[in-house]
Amino acid sequence: MDQSTLKYYSDNAAQVAERYESVVSDLSAHFADAFSKGGKILDVGCGSGRDLADLHKLGFDCYGVDPVLKFVEIAQRLHPELENRIALGKLPDLQVPFNGNFDGVLCSAVLMHIDIEQLPATATAIKSCLKVGGRLLYSVPSKRTDVVGSNRDANGRLFIPDQAVRLNSLFSSIGFTEIASWTNSDSMGRDSVEWMSVLLELQTA
């Protein structure tokens, strides 16, 4: 994952977590339909633990990883029900956590921070976490007008445009099939941002 992006999240973890916790993710409305009931789910880039806590409330056997130690600490403090269910881990060099064999992987607002050349390794790492028939639900921006020519916002975070197009082609090449995709507005109410969400299923090992 991009180092400048990681530094921003580490330096501003408390403020970012507060923003995350103040809104409900539009993606959470799809969790129950996207993943098998009671399935083992991994949230990659779980941040404040908001989505992970929602998965837990829905009865999923859920776990999370995040590359920012402060986020791991904040998530476990805000959501004590997630104790021993969150660990450090980052893409693309993610080691399969919590004994793997997941029924689902969630990557909400994460994959746009991955350099294009790291996408193949990222896709392989995600695939290695899933069992055949498992599903991946991810979201990336379909619009972000505050990102300039360098593909970075004012805070220095990397936002690769059109990432969904690359990702869908890449995941298709390693055994995934698209189940559904949709666009939605920004849960934080930012007019400059819209999201593309994609649900994929792993068909072959």
Language model feature labels by segment:
Residues M1-G38, L42, G47-F98, I114-A121, ...:
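Class I (Rossmann-like) S-adenosyl-L-methionine-dependent methyltransferase catalytic domain
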Residues L106:
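A conserved beta-strand element that flanks and buttresses the S-adenosyl-L-methionine
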Residues A109-H113:
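Short catalytic micro-motifs in class I SAM-dependent methyltransferases
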